[in-house]
From Swiss-Prot:
Enzyme class: translocase
Cellular component per GO, a single term: plasma membrane
Entry protein name: NADH-quinone oxidoreductase subunit A 1
Assembly and oligomerization: NDH-1 is composed of 14 different subunits. Subunits NuoA, H, J, K, L, M, N constitute the membrane sector of the complex.
Principal subcellular localization: membrane
Organism: Geobacter sulfurreducens (strain ATCC 51573 / DSM 12127 / PCA)
Localization per record: Cell inner membrane
Gene name of the encoded protein: nuoA1
Family membership noted in the UniProt record: Belongs to the complex I subunit 3 family.
Catalytic activities: a quinone + NADH + 5 H(+)(in) = a quinol + NAD(+) + 4 H(+)(out)
Summary of the function given for this chain in its UniProt record: NDH-1 shuttles electrons from NADH, via FMN and iron-sulfur (Fe-S) centers, to quinones in the respiratory chain. The immediate electron acceptor for the enzyme in this species is believed to be ubiquinone. Couples the redox reaction to proton translocation (for every two electrons transferred, four hydrogen ions are translocated across the cytoplasmic membrane), and thus conserves the redox energy in a proton gradient.
Length: 118
């Protein structure tokens, strides 16, 4: 039983060891000379304008959450579409219920005005 999972365990161990070794060596070897230029926020090579600690509207976060929600919907629908014939009527009903729940949530968000940009 362990033989089946041994390659995955080795892969995870190598990844963790490599990550920790990279962090350790970079902190030991890297230069630690902070200056005002190094601590300034980077804006695509342009001179920084204003403060980097600016507040954003909540609407940006709502749109981001909706994007993630519908991205997850696509993640669930892809395997369902691949296994469509094997799942039978149960799979169709289950995915239909999932889409209806998402659609009701979308209508709720729309009625609340979260998609209105003013």
């Amino acid at each position: 039983m362990l033989g089946v999972y041994l390659p995955i365990i080795v892969l995870v161990a190598v990844a963790v060891i490599f990550g920790l070794a990279s962090l350790t060596f970079s902190s030991l070897i890297g230069q630690k000379k902070p200056s005002a230029v190094k601590l300034a926020p980077y804006e695509c090579g342009c001179e920084p304008v204003g403060s980097a600690r600016e507040r954003f509207s909540v609407k940006f976060y709502i749109i981001a959450m909706l994007f993630i929600l519908f991205d997850i919907e696509a993640v669930f629908m892809y395997p369902w579409s691949v296994l469509f014939k094997r799942l039978g009527i149960f799979g169709v009903v289950e995915m239909g219920l999932f889409i209806v729940i998402l659609f009701v949530g979308y209508i709720y968000v729309w009625k609340k005005g979260a998609l209105e940009w003013e």
